[in-house]
Amino acid sequence: MEKKETRQSYGEELAILGEKNQNIVVLDADLSSATKTDIFAKKFHDRFFDIGIAEQDMVSTAAGFATCGKIPYVSTFAMFCAGRAYDQIRNSICYPKLNVKICATHAGVTVGEDGATHQMIEDLSLMRTIPNMTVISTCDDIQTKWAVNEISKIEGPVYLRLY
């Protein structure tokens, strides 16, 4: 069996979920080739939104989609999600308990070549303190496939941490 990056499994499973559920929309912050949401984008370009390097806007947009019955999957690096968009996650998604899936890639120190500005180890502690947030951290590609499917069954905010 070939071992894959967790984000590769995330992108593949997200595209499969997109076939099963037309209410799934995917938002990315100009990193779709890195987060692997480009797999979803190629199949469902009308349900994929590249917000650009504007993580706070992306999270707020996801909250808006959720209030209209869509199921947003927000994807970016853990640093930019938990770091830059913390207030929006806390106040716009978690307090009203909106059904938004936040999928943060490049967690920990796995992006060594990008330097300390792209590394995030405190995202787990930040996300775990927010009321109504479910936090899941996967260890490999197999567990990631399972987790992507399981979080789709959770009604409410989820933080999925990928390496």
Explain the meaning of each model-derived region:
Residues M1-Y163:
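Thiamine diphosphate
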